[in-house]
Amino acid sequence: RGMYDAQPEAKGWQEKEDKGVADRLAKAKTDPKAQTVWSNGPHMNWNGMVAPLVGYSFKGALWYQGESNAGQAAAYKWILGDMIKAWHKAWGREFPFIIVQLPRFMAKKPVAVEDGGWPVIRESMEWIADHVPGAMMSVNIDLGEEKDIHPKDKLPIGERLAAVALQRVYQTRAVGQAPRVTKAELQGDAWVVTYDRPVALQGDGKGWAVQKADGS
């Protein structure tokens, strides 16, 4: 089963010694019926798919995950942030780690406000890109599908990952970094939104919301 085909929690990709799991795996070598370990459990993906690659050379990593951590979204920035640092330590270098910020999912809402863990996961990914060495992020909120948590059309997401890598890693003139809002002011009956770089917007301007400093 390939790494792309699973949606385990991020902690499954962390490195950690788990004696209970190790004992069960050792027994399973001689008794196939004893193999009851959940393949996506804590540290299983690391030991099964990542640890064997330590020592090999590569340019960087692409990370598309987060849906399964929505139930513990507030802790995600620490879980994924620590995992990235652990991977860097394992290879002895701070290689590029490009995160796919979760795209949209489910039907459009009458107001541009989304509750639940997904928005927090997206904010955590942005925080990690700002604070963890080597971490970067591609924005995909305008992509995704209403009824499929795994969008079938992966090409646009791949193109954006490539653009981030070309701009941030290979230092080309590609544009991979999405613009960010730096200020929003109410002037009369209109909102004036300022971005950190020139943008070309298309649309009716109705699909956005403003959060106050108190979180409301």
Residue ranges and their predicted role:
Residues 1-216:
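Cell-envelope and extracellular/periplasmic
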